Amino acid sequence: MYTQAIDLAPGANPVRPEAASARDAAFEAAIAQDRKVEAQDWMPEGYRKTLVRQISQHAHSEVVGMLPEGNWVTRAPSLKRKAILLAKIQDEGGHGLYLYAAAETLGVARDDLIDALLSGRAKYSSIFNYPAPSWADMGAIGWLVDGAAIMNQILSLIHI
């Protein structure tokens, strides 16, 4: 049930569906019927926590993804490519801001999410930890990351 078993302490048992409250059962039924759940709607705390973790990880990846690209702004092979790279960096920052705003609607403070990133408690896409010593490396990393994101989005649409 929404990956909360990952967060369990060793030896702990997850809550069994039969032990869940009527409110939990109603929420599970709504999910099973593919009903939309809005941020202000009641949801189990584990579900909300998982959403915040997923959204913040995505936001952090957008922001951290700007860093290797930013290193290449002054070394881009042409003015046209420099302008394209600056636009891509700006897009990544904007995506991160949108995602932080979405997480805030779930009741967390943006400052807390950023503090978790800066302290190393939060996760982000590890591909950005690898060096991009050439313009081609930087392009390949961007292509692979964006391509993987597009495939995830397409596959999620297929399974609707």
Residues of each region from the PLM?
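Alpha-helical scaffold segments that form or flank carboxylate-/histidine-based iron centers
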Residues: 47-58, 76-95, 134-138
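Alpha-helical transition-metal enzyme core signature, strongest for iron centers
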Residues: 55-69, 88-103, 120-124, 139-150
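Acidic/His metal-coordination segments adjacent to aromatic residues that form catalytic metal sites
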Residues: 36-56, 117-143
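Conserved alpha-helical segments that form or flank metal/cofactor-binding pockets of metalloenzymes
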Residues: 2-24, 88-116
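Helix-loop segments that flank and shape redox-cofactor active sites
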Residues: 44, 65-87, 149-158
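Non-cleavable N-terminal signal-anchor transmembrane helices
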Residues: 1-56
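Conserved small/polar residues in nucleotide/adenosyl-binding loops
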Residues: 1, 158-160
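Short, highly charged low-complexity linear segments
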Residues: 8-26, 122-131, 149-157
